[in-house]
């Protein structure tokens, strides 16, 4: 028996040594390098093909959004009268993400203090506190019925929680979805039974909550997937099968959730695409990138119809009062050349981190790395205001589904609810 055991141990050691030989490790490293080289080659080829397609589209594109709206009257500063009526205080660390409920009565927030909180949007009072299974949260979501909430982040998992009406401080875990091999950057409920996840492993996934399993994987991206967007359906607990994704590969993809391949794609630029939002009618989409540009695409014409640039936004407002980029103060004296010379280096480092539209679609709210939340006139491509007041970096902006308020979240651990300040 002893001899047999010794033989077994010797055999086991020989097998182990076989699999950890330096040559084998070198082979594995070589295979990994080969895969990365193939991915990079595919990226470059894809960019070249998209450049040819965009060139052909540009030849037949007869107008842009700004050209068509040339005769529309510009908005003035006095039209943007949003005031921070409610400040939501309760978190002890940075606000990672937040969402409005479908009926606009609640706000779900997730923080790196290890909690998700549900707030009454009318009073600013806390309704529920949900301890997270991981404090390294990057995204949160609330179901259309507001009975489920979800969190995801650096632990590579998406956790679904039931919202309890009896126990206001509880961790009622319904499901934990595991399968991504890298961090989860964004999540969205498509309805009360399904949730989408976007991950740094270059894939998106659709999960069935009642069955607790993955339904489908979407893998067209060649870089980290950084954000998701779904068309708004404010009066329904069901949504369409359409969703969009964007990532570090510079692409925005439009998907039919029933198909594993994208139905439409737009090459934005070489920067990371951090923010994505559908226009109110669901027929256009905007993508915000690390280089500070916001591009709007029309799904029907399959092309870009507008680009919102901080340089253009400031310069276009020269005949009327404008906001200076250096300190965002209201000013009427400086010329376009002066503005450009004093702010160019500052504007170069302003990546877009969040986007949303007003209920009418005339205004677009965009959060930049250091500038904060800027308000755009969508039809004119001009900056018409700024939501100021946070003591730290503004990380997100979302308008309520009913259109009556806007919420901003910040690294100062607070959120502010903005609504019209009528006198």
Swiss-Prot record:
CDD domains: WD40 (cd00200)
Stretches forming WD repeats: 90-120, 132-162, 179-208, 220-256, 268-298, 348-377, 389-419
Taxonomy, superkingdom: Eukaryota
Keyword Repeat listed: yes
UniProt-listed GO biological process terms: chemotropism; establishment of protein localization to plasma membrane; G protein-coupled receptor signaling pathway; invasive growth in response to glucose limitation; pheromone-dependent signal transduction involved in conjugation with cellular fusion; protein localization to mating projection tip; regulation of pheromone-dependent signal transduction involved in conjugation with cellular fusion; response to pheromone triggering conjugation with cellular fusion
PROSITE patterns to which the protein is assigned, alphabetical: WD_REPEATS_1, WD_REPEATS_2, WD_REPEATS_REGION
GO cellular component, one term: mating projection
Keywords: Pheromone response, Repeat, Transducer, WD repeat
A GO term for molecular function: small GTPase binding
Entry keyword Cell wall biogenesis/degradation: no
Pfam name, any one: WD40_Gbeta
Extra remark: Present with 2050 molecules/cell in log phase SD medium.
SUBUNIT field: G proteins are composed of 3 units, alpha, beta and gamma. The beta-gamma subunit complex (STE4-STE18 complex) interacts with PLP1 and PLP2. Interacts with SYG1.
UniProt function note: Implicated in the a- and alpha-factor response pathway. The beta and gamma chains of the putative yeast mating response pathway G protein play a positive role in initiation of the mating response. The beta and gamma chains are required for the GTPase activity, for replacement of GDP by GTP, and for G protein-effector interaction.
Protein family according to the UniProt entry: Belongs to the WD repeat G protein beta family.
Database matches in PANTHER family: GUANINE NUCLEOTIDE-BINDING PROTEIN BETA G PROTEIN BETA
Name by which UniProt lists this protein: Guanine nucleotide-binding protein subunit beta
Organism: Saccharomyces cerevisiae (strain ATCC 204508 / S288c)
Record lineage: Eukaryota, Fungi, Dikarya, Ascomycota, Saccharomycotina
Chain's gene name: STE4
């Amino acid at each position: 028996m002893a001899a047999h055991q010794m033989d077994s141990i010797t055999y086991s050691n020989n097998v182990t040594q076989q699999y950890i030989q330096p040559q084998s490790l070198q082979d594995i490293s070589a295979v990994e390098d080969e895969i990365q080289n193939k991915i990079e080659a595919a990226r470059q080829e894809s960019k070249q093909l998209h450049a040819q397609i965009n060139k052909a589209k540009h030849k037949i594109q007869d107008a842009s959004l700004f050209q068509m709206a040339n005769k529309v009257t510009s908005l003035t500063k006095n039209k943007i009268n949003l005031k921070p009526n409610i400040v939501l205080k309760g978190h002890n660390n940075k606000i990672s993400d937040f969402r409005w409920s479908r009926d606009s009565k609640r706000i779900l927030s997730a923080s790196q203090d290890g909690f998700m909180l549900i707030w009454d949007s009318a009073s600013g009072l806390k309704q529920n506190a949900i301890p997270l299974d991981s404090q390294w949260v990057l995204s949160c979501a609330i179901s259309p019925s507001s009975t489920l909430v979800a969190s995801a982040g650096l632990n590579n998992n998406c956790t679904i929680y039931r919202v309890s009406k009896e126990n206001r401080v509880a961790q009622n875990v319904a499901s934990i979805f595991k399968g991504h091999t890298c961090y989860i950057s964004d999540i969205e409920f498509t309805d009360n039974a399904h949730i989408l996840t976007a991950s740094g492993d270059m894939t998106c996934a659709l999960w069935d909550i009642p069955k607790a399993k993955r339904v489908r994987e979407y893998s067209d991206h060649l870089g980290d997937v950084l954000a998701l967007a779904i068309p708004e359906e404010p009066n329904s607990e069901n949504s369409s099968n359409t969703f969009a994704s964007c990532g570090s590969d510079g692409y925005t993809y439009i998907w039919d959730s029933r198909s594993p391949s994208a139905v439409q794609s737009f090459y934005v630029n070489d920067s990371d695409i951090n923010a994505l939002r559908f226009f109110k009618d669901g027929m256009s989409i905007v993508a915000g990138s690390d280089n500070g540009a916001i591009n709007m695409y029309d799904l029907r014409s399959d092309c870009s119809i507008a680009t919102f640039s901080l340089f253009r936004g400031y310069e276009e407002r020269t005949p009327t009062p404008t906001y200076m980029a250096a300190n965002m103060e209201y000013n009427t004296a400086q010329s376009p050349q002066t503005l450009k010379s004093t702010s160019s280096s500052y504007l170069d480092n302003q990546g877009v981190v969040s986007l949303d539209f007003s209920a009418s679609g005339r205004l677009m709210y965009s959060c930049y790395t250091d500038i904060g939340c800027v308000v755009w006139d969508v039809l004119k491509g001009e900056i018409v205001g700024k939501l100021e007041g946070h003591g730290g970096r503004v990380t997100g902006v979302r308008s309520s589904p009913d259109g009556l308020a806007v919420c901003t979240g910040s690294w100062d651990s607070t959120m502010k609810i903005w609504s019209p300040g009528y006198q």
